[in-house]
Amino acid sequence: MFRWENFTTANGLPDNHVFCVLVDGDRVWTGTDNGLGLFENGKWRSFRPNPDAKEHSLAHQAVLSLALDKNTGDVWAGTMGGLSRISAGRIDTYTQLNSGLSNDIVYGVGVQGDYLWTATAAGASRLNIRTGQWSLYNAFNTPMYEIWTYAVSPSEDKVYYAVWGGGVLEYDQKTERWKDYNDPDGETEMVVMKDQGLIHEITTSLSYVDKILWVATYFGASRYDGRYWHNFLKKDSGMPSNFLSQIKAIDANRAWFSTDKGLAYFDGTNWAVYRPALDTHQPEMYITDVAGNSKKEIPVKTAPSHNYILGVDFQGDDIWVATAHGLSHGIRENNSVAKR
């Protein structure tokens, strides 16, 4: 169980529409529709494009994605107008004009070792942070039949891309080969074969943890262990909706699901949902079994600021939540149902 405190423009947030959130130790970064926000020592600071600074200010005011380079402490921000790196107070911006970035609309960013991976509206890019060399990946050198890459999850052995309308792409770091995963029934309007493969082609997010791949789509979610697929739908799970913006795994069995009708947590056995009630807008929390049955309402006094959830990140036992109207901080209480 969490006690929720919420942030909007009324108490310092750059904009109420929050696309993403990134925890950086004691600091919290948030990408909004009107600037990059930094919450530190109880205060907000905002970063926006400065026409006079050119390549040394934020690329665009709409910040879609964030990633932390744990080796350097740098923060990378994907925006609607390029890629920006925030390093010790200095901002450097990369666009199609001054770098090897494949497109200026950067939906996803991820750092693994010396490499920064980006998901853009026209394919994927990889930057060797140490040498400055760029590599481009698109329909010409990968099985990417749609080039709208929406999210990326890099790890030491694999890099996974969510391709909007094109399923999932897997890059093997050792062999440098690509592989694609798609909806086996090819049916965009319904699920014909539930656990035979990826639930749907329109993928929005993925999370690769403990050799398990979790995938979010607009029509449900999938879990893949390298051999078997298991898919989640509202009708046979505790998800409040099939429309997902993000999925973020904790380990092989536990994950958080960001949907348009609330924030859901699955621990491998039970589900917990946090949201303002869809009808009364009052704080609501409930738990169900693995199939979404045996629903039990839990009395709560607080909830995330909006039911439309776009993403989460973790700060110890706490959780930070990006929503369509504000940023929420879930402070875990001792009798918590959902444990990190």
Task: Kindly give the residue locations of the regions a language model identified.
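Carboxylate-rich, polar loop motifs that coordinate divalent cations or form catalytic acidic clusters
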Residues: 1-340
